Amino acid sequence: MRITISGRNVDLGDRLKNQVNKKLGKLEKYFAPDTEARVVLSRRKDAEIIEVTIPTRNGFIRAEEATDDFFASIDLAEETI
């Protein structure tokens, strides 16, 4: 599985990218190697948001989580997927 990470109003540091890759990397065994997971991290005044979209043969698997901390949002998105 390939993971593409982008950000809106966010400086994507190595620590944040590594955390996303680590958490979503655990899901690789459930998807084909050519599957591309798209991750968008964004910040609003009151929340830090992660959106994960994974296309499948039958549609999409999608998770969106918003908390006051990116790392908590990443954990929740992993659990949702």
Region roles according to the model:
Residues M1-I81:
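N-terminal, polar/charged subdomain of small-to-medium soluble alpha/beta proteins
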